[in-house]
């Protein structure tokens, strides 16, 4: 367990008060956590304010909390919401820092070795460091993470023991401080001052922590004693104030002291000799030569620099772990008594289960053909049972909890009442005979009322044919297929909300960001064809797409009623009955959600010279494209500053498209 420096309380800031069945959900969750219950489920219907309930629980139980989402986009949305709810506490973001990642791999059939290739997002790397350092410094920490949090990260003990602690009056020579900084992978650069670097000017050492992006620290010496420490703006050097204590955390999460490094190198050398003997005995001379050359180079780098590319593949030796022992992960940076909340648990727990096997098969190929030592197999994500061993207390959050969650606990807390009074939609089943003409009539009725329609099909061909037919019938319709990129998808949803078109056809309309209050009709074709999108959970999630409009209605087109359909219909009717009773008792009239239509900082197409005028980037000349790139760069920076990394990545991709034309 890591000792914390400060013991702060969570302070929730919100203009809202718990309403509907939020108060009882919050009370039950808190009572169960304080009573020591290990696992429970918050089964919250779409639009009932689950994130607000989670925030209330965190503020009341006052435990460091890890919130896990199943992708970066959802993690980013949750991070933004928790930042708003807890402005005075440490809300951190921990996802994969790769913008692009091609893992190291070998394809024996074509004798192709694919070297690891990646592009690291500096902003996300900073936030990862901010998360781990916050966990060592304070206890009022919420970390919102993707499943990246179950991947190997390096020893938290080594990380904590390597912290360079400075305060005015401390007796330490300037050169000793410089050596200490180099030992924790800081780089000296007196000209290009960036995160993870330091510079020296006489008796002044300026240090730019890995967890900061604007502020650095100026350490001033008087002889062999620190005279004072000041926080400064990294760019301008402007002094922001003096500090009494400064903790400099390592610039990398994989850090080892000199003594441990010598032991690790000796173990790597011994394993190399052992594996070379195995290859030679099997007559694999090419593999033996390859492994010897690669590993000896890495050993030399570790001895001289304390680091090498792919250092994580030696993490078992550097951490002092036994073969097969789980790696250290973000979870090990938390104290023992921490809380885990799994958002959209029916998706996220499946991901946690699947990570290990995919990683293992790729690495086994590298080991068998002499690209890596067998110990590289222990640089891996956690198995699900290893993840479970880290769990002290956990809350699974989902509108449709999976079988796994239901096996873990019988404690299910429902949150069905929406603060807006909105009801789950009415669901009806209609025969497939004449379904297209029937649906056309329903669409026209919605168009007259300025409402939108979602249609979900099972095949790409059906979606395309349906779209073509409705276009011929004069309907403004679009088809959203799986090849559409995030930015384009956001544009389509925005255009649907604005009324540029009225009907959206798709196969999977359960992706994030497809909550549209203007949608009053959801049509499910082939509802009786069992499968992932037509099982009970898939149907309930799809039905939920019509739950943000007071006129919400769902039509399932099917010739038989499957068990999945019946269970989904029954569950929706049960929730609707509870919601109606609550509204009647409290005199609430359901109101369609009023949600602002946010234009992605006006860059979802191309920046136009005149407002509301779209421009084809192919029609721009070289100078105009240059100006467009400048505007996009500025907007990308603005997005980063407000921590909207998904948007920043979208703008970056667009910028690359424009640059590619030159």
UniProtKB/Swiss-Prot annotation:
Pfam families per UniProt: Helicase_C, ResIII, UVR, UvrB, UvrB_inter
PROSITE patterns assigned to the protein according to its UniProt record, in alphabetical order: HELICASE_ATP_BIND_1, HELICASE_CTER, UVR
GO cellular component: cytoplasm; excinuclease repair complex
Main location: cytoplasm
GO molecular function, one term: excinuclease ABC activity
Location within or outside the cell: Cytoplasm
Segments forming domain UVR: 626-661
Beta-hairpin, short sequence motif: residues: 97-120
Annotated ATP binding sites: 44-51
A GO biological process held by the record: SOS response
Record comment regarding domains: The beta-hairpin motif is involved in DNA binding.
Subunit record text: Forms a heterotetramer with UvrA during the search for lesions. Interacts with UvrC in an incision complex.
Protein family membership: Belongs to the UvrB family.
Reported function: The UvrABC repair system catalyzes the recognition and processing of DNA lesions. A damage recognition complex composed of 2 UvrA and 2 UvrB subunits scans DNA for abnormalities. Upon binding of the UvrA(2)B(2) complex to a putative damaged site, the DNA wraps around one UvrB monomer. DNA wrap is dependent on ATP binding by UvrB and probably causes local melting of the DNA helix, facilitating insertion of UvrB beta-hairpin between the DNA strands. Then UvrB probes one DNA strand for the presence of a lesion.
Protein's UniProt name: UvrABC system protein B
Organism of provenance: Streptococcus pneumoniae serotype 19F (strain G54)
Gene: uvrB
């Amino acid at each position: 367990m890591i000792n914390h420096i400060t013991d702060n309380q969570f302070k929730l800031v919100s203009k809202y008060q718990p309403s509907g069945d939020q108060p009882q959900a919050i009370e039950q969750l808190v009572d169960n956590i304080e009573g020591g219950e290990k696992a429970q489920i918050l089964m919250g219907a779409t639009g009932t304010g689950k994130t607000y309930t989670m925030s209330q629980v965190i503020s009341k139980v006052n435990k460091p909390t890890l919130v896990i989402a199943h992708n970066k986009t959802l993690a980013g949305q949750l991070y933004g919401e928790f930042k708003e709810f807890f402005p005075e506490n440490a809300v951190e973001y921990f996802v994969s820092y790769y913008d692009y990642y091609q893992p190291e791999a070998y394809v024996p059939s074509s004798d192709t070795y694919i070297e690891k290739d990646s592009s690291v997002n500096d902003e996300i790397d900073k936030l990862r460091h901010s998360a781990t350092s916050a966990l060592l410094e304070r206890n009022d920490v919420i970390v919102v993470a993707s499943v990246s949090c179950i991947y190997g990260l390096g020893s938290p003990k080594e990380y904590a023991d390597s912290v360079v602690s400075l305060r005015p009056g401390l007796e330490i020579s300037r050169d000793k401080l410089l050596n200490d900084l180099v030992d924790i992978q800081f780089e000296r650069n007196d000209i290009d001052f960036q995160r993870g670097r330091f510079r020296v000017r006489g008796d002044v050492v300026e240090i730019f922590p890995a967890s900061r992006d604007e502020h650095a620290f100026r350490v001033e010496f008087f002889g062999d004693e620190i005279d004072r420490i000041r926080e400064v703006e990294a760019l301008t050097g402007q002094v922001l104030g003096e500090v009494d204590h400064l903790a400099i955390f390592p610039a990398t999460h994989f850090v080892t002291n000199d003594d441990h490094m010598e032991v690790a190198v000796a173990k790597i050398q011994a394993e190399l000799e052992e594996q070379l003997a195995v290859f030679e005995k099997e007559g694999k001379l090419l593999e033996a030569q390859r492994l010897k050359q690669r590993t000896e180079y890495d050993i030399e780098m570790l001895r001289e620099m304390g680091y090498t590319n792919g250092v994580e593949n030696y993490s078992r030796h550097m951490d002092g772990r036994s073969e097969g022992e789980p790696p250290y992960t973000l979870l090990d940076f938390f104290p023992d008594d921490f809380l885990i909340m799994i958002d959209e648990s029916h998706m996220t727990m499946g991901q946690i289960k699947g990570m290990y096997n995919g990683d293992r098969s790729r690495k086994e190929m590298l080991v068998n053909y002499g690209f890596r030592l067998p110990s590289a197999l222990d640089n891996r994500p956690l198995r699900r049972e290893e993840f479970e061993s880290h769990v002290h207390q956990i809350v699974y959050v989902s509108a449709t909890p999976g079988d796994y969650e239901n096996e873990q606990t019988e404690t299910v807390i429902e949150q069905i009442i929406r603060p807006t009074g909105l009801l789950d939609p009415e669901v009806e089943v209609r025969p497939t005979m004449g379904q297209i003409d029937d649906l056309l009539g329903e669409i026209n009725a919605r168009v007259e009322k300025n409402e939108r329609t979602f249609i979900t099909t099972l095949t790409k061909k059906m979606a395309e044919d349906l779209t073509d037919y409705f276009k011929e019938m004069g309907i403004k319709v679009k088809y959203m297929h799986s090849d559409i990129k995030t930015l384009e998808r956001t544009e389509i949803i925005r255009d649907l909300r604005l009324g540029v078109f009225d009907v959206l056809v798709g196969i999977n309309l359960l992706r994030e960001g497809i909550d549209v209050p203007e949608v009053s009709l959801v049509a499910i074709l082939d509802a009786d064809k069992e499968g992932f999108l037509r099982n009970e959970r898939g149907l309930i999630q799809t039905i939920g797409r019509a739950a943000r409009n007071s006129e919400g209605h769902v039509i399932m087109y099917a010739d038989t009623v499957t068990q999945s359909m019946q269970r989904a219909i029954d569950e929706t009717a049960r929730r609707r009955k509870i919601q109606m009773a609550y509204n009647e008792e409290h005199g609430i009239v359901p109101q369609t959600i009023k949600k602002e239509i946010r234009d992605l900082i006006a860059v979802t197409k191309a920046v136009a010279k005149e407002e509301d005028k779209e421009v084809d980037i192919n029609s721009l000349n070289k100078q105009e494209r240059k100006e467009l790139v400048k505007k996009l760069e500025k907007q990308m920076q603005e997005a980063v500053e407000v921590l909207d990394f998904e948007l920043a990545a979208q703008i970056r991709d667009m910028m690359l498209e424009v640059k590619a034309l030159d």
